[in-house]
Amino acid sequence: MLAHSKRDNSLTKRLLRAFRRGLSRPTYGLEWGDPDTVEPLKFIRDRYVLPYVDARHNAVEIGPGGGRWTRYLVGFRTLYAVDYHQELLDELGRNFRCRSNIRFVRNNGADFPGIAASSIDYLFSFGTFVHLEFHLIESYLTSIRSIIKPGANVVIQYSDKTKIMAQLNKGFSDNSPVKMRDAVRAADYNIIEEDTTSLWHSAVIRFTR
C-alpha cells in the first residue's frame, strides 16, 4: 500500500511539472508524445478517438493528465474528465477554462460520482490503466458498465508486459492482452477490436456492453 501511494505521488508530481512546463505551448504532448506528431499515437487518435466524437453524445476520459487527448474529446456534448488527483483536475480546468461542456470529476479510485447511469456513449483512457494494479482495473470494468449505454464504445490502453519496453518500465503494471481480454469478458462485455502491435509497450482494446 505504501509503495503504491509513493508511486501515485511521484506520478502526480511529474504530471504537475509537465503541466507547468507546457502551459505556454499551444499543443500538449508532455513527455509521453504528441498524438499530432508521433505516428503510433496518430494512428490511435485517428482510429479510436476522432471517429467517435459526436456533439450529440456524452463521453468520459479517465486520467486526462495534461490534456493531450482531452483536446480531441471536447467536441462531445458533455465530457467528464475523471481523475483521483484533484491537483491534476485543477490544472486541467485552467487549461480548458473556456470549455463549458467539460465536467471535472474527482473519484475515489474506480467510481464515477455524479455521472448518471447509462448516460455515456464513449469512454476513453490512455496513459492511466498502464499504471493500475490489476484489481483496480477489474474494479473499473465493473463500474464502467453502470454508466455506459448499451452499444457504447469503451477504448482503454493498458500495459503489455509481454513487450520488452513494458518490462523495462517499473511503473507499468503486470498485464497482457490475455489477462485484459479475460477480464473484459468476465465483466460481461463484448470485445469489438484489439490493437496489440501499434504501441511499443502497451495495447489497446475497444469493447461494448
Enumerate the predicted regions with their spans.
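A short acidic, Gly/Pro-enriched loop at the edge of an enzyme's catalytic core
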Residues: 113-123
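Conserved acidic functional residues
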Residues: 70, 117, 127
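A short SAM/SAH-binding and catalytic strip from SAM-dependent methyltransferases
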Residues: 122-135
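Compositionally biased regions
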Residues: 6, 119, 146-150
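Class I (Rossmann-like) S-adenosyl-L-methionine-dependent methyltransferase catalytic domain
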Residues: 1-56, 60-114, 132-139, 143, ...
